[in-house]
Amino acid sequence: MIVTTDGFYTTTDPEEVRRRFIERISAVSSMEDGRIFATDQDKPCNNLVQITAMEPFVQTKKIIKVEGFHMDSAPIDAVKHELEKYTGLSHLSTGKNNVEITNITAQKGLALKKYIKKLGLTEDEVMVLGDSQNDLSMFEHFKYSFAPENSCRG
């Protein structure tokens, strides 16, 4: 799935991506969560547009994030290993069966540091909460960092 400033896109059949996305959500949380995703029209998986030509797409869209998922974690691990070769990119997972690729500066911790500076606060005046790998940059930048007991272990 490719996330841009104006929507969600895929290079494959949107219905297949939607089905697999819901399957993945159901596998890692509950079947009820999968049903919620299946019926909530605001969810990205329900608003995918198929890309027919990549070159014009990348020339006209501002890409925020690329996400890949697979029920088997081995292909995801292989992609993560390959991504280590590239500078300027950050990758993380919110579970064992996905990888999210963003610009290296697109991290919650860096964004929060900028925001609190704008508010006139110091890092010692901020507490952060997170439960997944996409929260790690906040934990690295703020000493008052907490995660619930049931959070992702990496």
Task: Kindly give the residue locations of the regions a language model identified.
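Conserved acidic, metal-coordinating active-site core of Asp-based
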Residues: 3-129, 133-138, 150
